[in-house]
Design a protein with these regions (language model features):
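Gly/Pro-rich, tryptophan- and cysteine-flecked surface segments typical
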Residues: 1-122
Length: 122
């Protein structure tokens, strides 16, 4: 039985702006784990409300490894930046089944909020 799925969709992307305290970095992150014995070749498709999708290819995740991709940092070989306060969806496509979750740390209030969610899989 496969451990994970090849397609994951996370619909609630919205990189929060930075708060007033420079010591804390608000961010979003995509965490992926490969529980198989094969390397996973992964692409990320960012889907927006008002512009064409952006595809980031060339992500590899070795067998029995995990990774965390910070979405507030440059992505891919071209250094694509999401930008703050932009609504988006991430479609994760993998050559082999993986597990994935999405997390957000919002630091705009003193009682910072972090949450993670499992995406829709198929």
């Amino acid at each position: 039985m496969a451990k994970g799925k090849k397609n994951w969709v996370f619909c609630d992307g919205y990189l929060p702006p930075h708060g007033d305290n420079p010591e804390f970095e608000g961010h979003e992150a995509l965490m992926m784990t490969n529980l198989t014995g094969k390397v996973a070749n992964i692409s990320l498709t960012f889907i927006f409300e008002d512009k064409d999708p952006v595809v980031i290819d060339g992500i590899t995740l070795d067998a029995m490894r995990t990774t965390c991709i910070r979405l507030d940092h440059p992505l891919g070989k071209d250094g694509f930046m999401l930008g703050e306060s932009v609504q988006y969806t991430i479609w994760v496509k993998s050559s082999t089944p993986i597990c994935a979750c999405f997390g957000r740390l919002d630091v705009r209030q003193t009682n910072m909020a972090y949450y993670s969610v499992e995406g829709y899989t198929f």
